[in-house]
Regions:
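Short, acidic/hydrophobic/Gly-rich beta-strand patch recurrent on exposed beta strands
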Residues: 1-2, 125-128, 309
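Terminal RNA-binding accessory module
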Residues: 1-54
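Short, conserved phosphate/pyrophosphate- and ester-handling motifs at nucleotide-, phospho-/glycolipid
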Residues: 14, 143, 252
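Hydrophobic beta-strand signal
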Residues: 18-20, 110, 276
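Extended interfacial segments that mediate partner engagement and assembly in macromolecular machines
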Residues: 34-167
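Short, solvent-exposed loop/turn elements at beta->coil junctions and helix N-caps
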Residues: 95-102, 169-173, 214-220
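Rossmann-like S-adenosyl-L-methionine
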Residues: 189-321
């Protein structure tokens, strides 16, 4: 507009739109779509009822209005543009993109908990876009189906607790077999009655209940037998990686399988090969690489992750690698 670039939230290439201005800078403006006069061929109807770009819309994802294959193409373009604008680098060749499921692929999330009297009580969900407010969401087509189905019942559970004002977050993690853990961040110790309700919820929904009174390393299961119950599978390599619900893992297990397989295939490791994996974490690459190489060295700064990676190597018969 008038020779100035305008970035418009919610608009797609080739569309004619009417937008509202959000802010103006010397070299560009920011705006948000208010109506669409001519739609792009890649625009689709969002599946989520609270997806959008206006006030109150969910900040959990940003591309449901774009056809799934076009989303991948767009992300690829963003990567190439960033490499050039920041690093002045252009790839000599590009691998074909990896595609995965469009819906219910997110196996981990941090959900904010807020008791909001103006909205009728407890909310459990993602933040609204560009806001500290919690979105009034009752389902989520991105989270795994079982977790999406828990969102409204979780509101009822938290509402019934004496410490509902002292429980700011619920972290959710789902294993490759569907096993689910709920980590309740608590700023005050739950009462005996609170614990009974939490455990009853876990039994009803088939979820392991964890408490986190302080930082991530303080997270612990109410039942110690569930300490390493969650796991993800890499069947091509015969590897299972156990993890705590607060550990870093890829949110999309299906894509992770393909990514690990492709990376190791590209490495083309000889049988006598030696490999170093920096920032190895739980061993997402280290352990499957160990099934191909003669020796692997995993380097990681977190003592807890190192300990769990060692146990993972032993459990998968790779301790000597």
């Amino acid at each position: 507009r008038d020779g100035k670039v305008v970035f418009i939230q919610g608009a797609l290439p080739g569309e004619d739109v009417i937008y509202e201005e959000l802010r103006s800078k010397s070299s560009y403006d920011m705006g948000r779509v208010s109506s669409i006069l001519k739609e792009s061929v890649i625009r689709v109807k969002p599946r989520c009822p609270v997806f959008g770009f206006g006030p109150g819309s969910c900040g959990g994802c940003a591309m449901q209005h774009i056809e799934p294959l076009a989303q991948v193409a767009y992300k690829e373009k963003v990567l190439l543009d960033t490499l050039w604008h920041i690093g002045k680098v252009r790839p000599e060749s590009m691998l074909s993109p990896i595609y995965g499921p469009t819906w219910h692929y997110r196996h981990r999330a941090r959900l904010t908990v807020r008791d909001v009297a103006k909205k009728g009580g407890v909310l459990v969900g993602f933040h609204e876009k560009a806001s500290s407010y919690v979105c009034d969401m009752r389902e989520c087509p991105i989270l795994t189906k079982n977790v999406s189905d828990m969102l409204v019942p979780l509101r009822g559970l938290v509402s019934s607790l004496s410490i509902r004002q002292r429980m700011p977050q619920i972290e959710v993690a789902v294993g490759g077999d569907g096993r689910t853990a709920l980590v309740f961040r608590t700023l005050e110790e739950p009462s005996g009655e609170d614990m009974e309700r939490l455990l009853a919820f876990g039994r009803e929904w088939g979820a392991d209940i964890w408490l986190q009174p302080k930082g991530p390393e303080s997270a612990h299961p109410v039942d110690p037998a569930n300490e390493e119950a969650l796991g993800l599978e890499l069947p091509e390599f015969g590897v299972r990686i156990s993890f705590k619900p607060t550990d870093f893992t890829q949110v999309n297990h299906e894509l992770n399988e393909v990514m690990v397989s492709r990376a190791i295939r590209l490495l083309d490791i000889p049988k006598d090969g030696k490999v170093a994996d920096f920032f190895c974490g739980l061993g997402n690459f280290t352990l499957p690489i160990a099934t191909r190489a003669s020796r692997v060295i995993g380097i990681e700064g977190s003592e807890g992750l190192v300990a769990r990676a060692r146990r993972g190597a032993e459990a998968n018969g790779l301790k000597e690698k």
